[in-house]
Amino acid sequence: MEKKVQIAVYENENFKRVAEIVKKKSIATVCEEALCPNIMECWGSGTATFMIMGSICTRGCRFCYVLKGKPSPLDDEEPKRVAEAVKEMELDYVVITSVDRDDLSDGGAQHFANVVKTVKELNPGIIVEVLTPDFRGNIDAVKKVIDAGVDVFAHNVETVRRLTPIVRDPRASYEQSLNVLKYAENVIKKSSILLGLGETWDEIVETMRDLRSVGVSILVLSQYMRPSRKQLEVKKRYTLEEFKELEEIAYSMGFSAVISLPLARTSYKAKEAYFRAIENAKNHS
């Protein structure tokens, strides 16, 4: 019998506190903008993923709910507001992501770096994970973000090679994403694959193998869920048993940490995955 996936929906004091801080600081979160199914769990445990550089994306990937259009100019006060919010939430691990900003010459890399540096300065000892766009393949932009003091660098390949032109914006490419990850050096690397878009089992395994070949050590596998009728239809719903089997295959390939669950998203259980990766790296060193 197929096991069902259940979502715990509740509000506690932590949830309310996080919501109040986010509103007070006028900060966008991917939790809200992308309709993440884990918002109750994550905010309820006092964690959030901050989305910088506005909430309007210059790209139109066909799986994504984030609004596409012409973004507003960058807010120079945003690094300070994010850093203060992190401090008020008393976080020791933070995830920072962004929309694509193809309208900016560096894709927003300098602003990303400014946010990371300010968060680190105001919150000594904090672990910072970033989930970045591809910066149009600009490796100098990637290095600029990493050099700001990033502990985990995440960039999502999103889907298998064959489906990339269908699923992602034309300005994205499978090889470009692999190159971004390949040249992200001296940092723990992470990527995610959405399942249920029409890929085959062999293509999933091939994509996992490609990610390992460019040094990715943390892998997230999740079920694609259609956020509205404007996005692509779900082609297949994977069972918990299939997610477990893929997790085992991933570990056999040498990934240090794998989050393989229907409701997983890149930042889901990010802190747990980070420490698991660190521990596994020590055990194999």
Swiss-Prot record:
Its cofactor is [4Fe-4S] cluster. InterPro entries: Aldolase_TIM, Elp3/MiaA/NifB-like_rSAM, Lipoyl_synth, rSAM. Pathway: Protein modification; protein lipoylation via endogenous pathway; protein N(6)-(lipoyl)lysine from octanoyl-[acyl-carrier-protein]: step 2/2. [4Fe-4S] cluster 1 binds at residues 31, 36, 42, 267. The keyword Thylakoid does not apply. CDD domains: Radical_SAM (cd01335). It holds the Pfam family Radical_SAM. It catalyses: [[Fe-S] cluster scaffold protein carrying a second [4Fe-4S](2+) cluster] + N(6)-octanoyl-L-lysyl-[protein] + 2 oxidized [2Fe-2S]-[ferredoxin] + 2 S-adenosyl-L-methionine + 4 H(+) = [[Fe-S] cluster scaffold protein] + N(6)-[(R)-dihydrolipoyl]-L-lysyl-[protein] + 4 Fe(3+) + 2 hydrogen sulfide + 2 5'-deoxyadenosine + 2 L-methionine + 2 reduced [2Fe-2S]-[ferredoxin]. Its EC number is 2.8.1.8. It comes from the Archaea. Optimum temperature is 60 degrees Celsius. Keywords: 4Fe-4S, Cytoplasm, Iron, Iron-sulfur, Metal-binding, S-adenosyl-L-methionine, Transferase. [4Fe-4S] cluster 2 binds at residues 57, 61, 64. Residues 43-256 form the Radical SAM core domain. Binds 2 [4Fe-4S] clusters per subunit. One cluster is coordinated with 3 cysteines and an exchangeable S-adenosyl-L-methionine. The keyword Nucleotide-binding does not apply. Changing residue 267 to A/C: Loss of activity. Does not produce lipoyl product. GO terms for cellular component: cytoplasm. It is found in: Cytoplasm. Gene3D superfamilies: Aldolase class I. NCBIfam families: lipA, PRK05481.1, PRK12928.1. Belongs to the radical SAM superfamily. Lipoyl synthase family. This is Lipoyl synthase.
